[in-house]
Amino acid sequence: MSTIRPVFYVSDGTGITAETIGHSLLTQFSGFTFVAERMVFIDDAEKARDASQRILAASERYRVRPIVVNSCVNPYLSVILAESGALMLDVFAPFIGLLEHELNTSRHSCVGRAHGMVDFETYHRRINAMNFALAHDDGVAASYDEAEVILVAVSRAGKTPTCIYLALHYGIRAANYPLIDEDLNSDQLPLRLRPYRKKLFGLTINPERLQQIRQERRPNSRYAALDTCKREVAAAEQMFSAERITTLSTTHTSIEEISSKVLVTLGLQREMF
C-alpha cells in the first residue's frame, strides 16, 4: 500500500471546519504522507462535478484512493463528490439525523453558519479581543485592567500566538508580558504585574528549543546563545515557583492545548467561535 495519500478538504463555505476536523483525524496516523488540497465554496452542481473530476484525476495520478473530508451542507453535492470513488468522510452526515430526531425538527441547510458572521455582537467581541491582544503585545500597553488573561514568559516562548488564538477563537482579551533581564534578577513578580496576580499564567520552554527559535530570529547573537536561554528559562521558572504562578511548557504543546489549559486554570468559560 502506498504511503502517499491525496486528501481533499471540500466545503461549500470557507473549508475551516473540514480542514480542522480532517487534520485532527489524520494526525492520528503516522507513516503516511498526506498531500492535501482545499476545495472551498463548492456550492453548486457544476462546481461539485468539477471537484469530483479533480479528485478522480488524483486517484489516477497517485494510483491510490483519495480521502475526501466533506463539509458540504447540501446532500446532493455530496452525492456528486462521491462519484469520484474517493473515501468520503462527511463531517455532518453521522450527526444530523440523530439531532433532527432528538430535537424533533429538520435542519436548516444554510451554508457558512459555523464560521459566518451570523451573530454581529459575537463578531465584534472577537474583533475587539483581537485588537486588544495586538495593543497589549509584549508589554506595550501601560495597563492590564481590562485583560482577562496575562501570559508571562521569556521572549519567544509562545506568548503572542497563544494570545492571538485566544482572541480569535474565544474572544478572550489576552495580554502578554515579556520577562527581561531586569525582571529575571529577582524571584518576585515585576511591579506592573503584581496587581493582576489572579490573571497571570506562566509559559516556559526547553532552553534548547528556545535557542533554535531565537537563532532563526537573530542568528549568532547573544540573545540566541544557549547559555542565555538556559539562564533566562531557569530564572523565569524560579520566579513562577516562588510566586506560585501556574506554568505550562510550550516545548511540545500546541497552541490549542495551551489555550485550553489557560482557560481551565483561570476559570474562563467561553464558547469557541
From Swiss-Prot:
Bifunctional serine/threonine kinase and phosphorylase involved in the regulation of the phosphoenolpyruvate synthase (PEPS) by catalyzing its phosphorylation/dephosphorylation. Pfam families: Kinase-PPPase. The keyword Cytoplasm does not apply. It comes from Xylella fastidiosa (strain Temecula1 / ATCC 700964). One of its GO terms (molecular function) is protein serine/threonine kinase activity. This is Putative phosphoenolpyruvate synthase regulatory protein. The keyword Membrane does not apply. InterPro entries: Kinase-pyrophosphorylase, PSRP. ADP binds at A153, V154, S155, R156, A157, G158, K159, T160.
